[in-house]
Amino acid sequence: MDLPPLSLDQLSAVITAGPTPTDLYTSLSAYEEQACLLSATDPSEKDLLLEFYTAFFFSHLLTDQICEARALTRRIPREISRLDAMQTCSLLLRAVWQSKHTEIYKILRELPWPGRSQPLVQRYESYFQEKTLVEMSNSYETIRIAAAATYLGLDPAAVEGDIIEKFTACGWKWDSEKQLLHPKPVVTAPPKDDSLQNELSRVMALISNQGS
Amino acid sequence: MSDFLAYLTSAPSRPHGSANITDKCYDHQLRDLIAYLKQPGVAPSTADINGYLEAISPAVHSLSYLYLLRIRIQQLQEKTAVGVPNDLQPGGTLWNQTVKFLRSFDPIQIRYVGHEWRELVDSVANAALSVSKPILAVKMIRDALERLNTAGVFTSLHLMLVKLALLSSSYTYVLPVLDKLLCHFPSDTQNAHAGILLCSEHEPSTVFFTDSSGFSANLTYRDHLQFYMYSGMVYMALKKWDQASHCLGIVISAPTANSVSKIMVEAYKKWVLANLLGHGKLFSVPNLVAPHVTRVYQSLSKPYISLAEAFEKRDFQRLRTEISLGQTIWRADKNSGLVYQVFEAYDKFLIIKLGKTFSALTMPDVLQRASSCSKGSRDIEEFVVSLVMTKELRAKLSHSPGNETTTMLRFPLSSQSHALREEHIRFRLIQKEAALNTISRAITQTKITLETSHENLQVIAKNQKLAGSSERSGVVGSTEADGGGDLDEDLMGDGR
């Protein structure tokens, strides 16, 4: 099926449709070819390219494709990659790669982002918080409240009770005597991986063919 | 014009009108169509071709559509005297029609015109390269290869695809092709299965990819090595070290006569780095590599071996010196980026190694024990925490109570909780069960193919007994002894 032409409205429609991260990535990657055919020096197309590449960049982060996001920053036209928003994307990518939580929240919340990408910026912040919460739950046996708050980008100066409530709502326990939170490990099934089955089928087919 | 259109649409694809035709009849139809289209003077004028391209569907009449596209490209090339006419450049009309075709063609019809199909794919790659946008060809060629389904046969297009992926820095796009096992070269036409119809849907696809089918240019030893070398580089760019090591291992294990090729030596250097970055150690070369070849690798890659030795001995000063001394070598070999990552990997494996000696350490202890770590006291906790949180280090962290700001790093026997462990065991059991089912099904199929199933063997034994008793009783040439009995026919019915 032919894709509708890439335009600011179409891009907004794709972003606001709220697809799963994988679907968002798939939809936007289908538009990369159209984006390649636009001129980065034409002022009317420059905005569209900036919005597209920012959204595409976030779709990589939302699907945890950090290495490919780095590759994307290399194939963005130079005229676009020099723009402030793309420079901010690079800063964010470096902070994500280095696991600098405080910096990540600061970049997401305080630096300017193109208008149409705002929903994705907020979506990534929520995604990153959820991911970090799972990582903390499985990595820490006990954690100080300030540290836990920093990982989630919460204000450590906020009312302690509110922060504690946020974590206890996730099944964590609060030890008021020791002033420590006890995370509850999150059990997740490993991702389904068909590669072993596929390889086995191919090897067995090969043996069968060679034998006959 | 209507006669010509009638010819063009005379053999629709199987799901669109030819489903009830026998293979033999469909084969005739397609061969007749090709013979007609190849007749001299049958090519329509430019204006007509555009009309026909609009009139027919590339998915239903793939053979005819491909023929028209090729004629149009040739006409434009002759008219403009350039390899990539404007119309064929990305965004042009012909480009768009080619994209439409490569994303929807019928793989059965295309089996008859492999050469022409490959030429069209080559044109797409050249067109994308002519405007310095190789990425435009990457997804299209990947989709075309997936659609064609080469079933594990290596072709020159695989090499072209991986080269374009490296040129365009678009690595993930080609993984669906690189992740598949390639275990055949196009088969020798002489040995190709005779009497098999190209339109048959029940034969293994490998039968159709022969050295004369045209789907691949002539392949050389170098092409094979280059493909795996470039595939290794794609995986390294994505930090998939195991897959990278596997691909590079294929290159360094390639059979050699007298000399070792440069590409094999380059692959060895990258293989050393991939193993350092992925596993923190220098592996022995695969058993397939002859000792004299290993010696050649080692003598031509001395800086890399020294680097790996310093890494393995956890000698940070020496490692830093080796990296500094070899800068011109890393740059010349285009391995600077990989060598730069060695510092980070060194720190990681240093911390991981602590878990083999200690069961718990405070962060100041970690810094003291890993004194050669390139991280300072400020960064070490952040680094260790990120290793634990990303599951690269199997350990648990715990903060001390009260006002102490110490963080304890514990290396439990299992870093997983009971529930998590159970979930993983359950998952692995399911995985093993599926693997056993796959093997079991394949064994049954192989037995049928090789006629060694239990029932077959019983019938053979029975036949031999009968033949023996017939001979003894003087009756020769009975039906059962020839294997022509009812039971035999019934059993062998599906086995062929």
UniProtKB/Swiss-Prot annotation, chain A:
Pfam families to which the protein is assigned, alphabetical: CSN8_PSD8_EIF3K
Any one cellular-component term (Gene Ontology): COP9 signalosome
Keywords: Cytoplasm, Nucleus, Signalosome
Family annotation (PROSITE patterns): PCI
Domain spans labelled PCI: 26-193
Record-level GO BP terms: COP9 signalosome assembly; protein deneddylation
Major site of localization recorded for this protein: cytoplasm
Localization of this protein: Cytoplasm; Nucleus
Family classification: Belongs to the CSN8 family.
Assembly, per entry: Component of the COP9 signalosome (CSN) complex.
Protein's recorded name: COP9 signalosome complex subunit 8
Curated annotation (Swiss-Prot), chain B:
Annotated PANTHER family: 26S PROTEASOME NON-ATPASE REGULATORY SUBUNIT 3/COP9 SIGNALOSOME COMPLEX SUBUNIT 3, COP9 SIGNALOSOME COMPLEX SUBUNIT 3
GO cellular component annotations of the record: COP9 signalosome; cytoplasm
Compositionally biased residues, Acidic residues: 483-496
Region (Disordered) residue spans: 468-496
Residues of the PCI domain: 243-411
Protein name: COP9 signalosome complex subunit 3
Keyword line: Cytoplasm, Nucleus, Signalosome
Family: Belongs to the CSN3 family.
Function: Component of the COP9 signalosome (CSN) complex that acts as an regulator of the ubiquitin (Ubl) conjugation pathway by mediating the deneddylation of the cullin subunit of SCF-type E3 ubiquitin-protein ligase complexes. The CSN complex seems to link protein degradation to sexual development.
The protein's assembly and partners: Component of the COP9 signalosome (CSN) complex.
Subcellular location: Cytoplasm; Nucleus
Any one of the GO BP annotations: ubiquitin-dependent protein catabolic process
Domain of life, source organism: Eukaryota
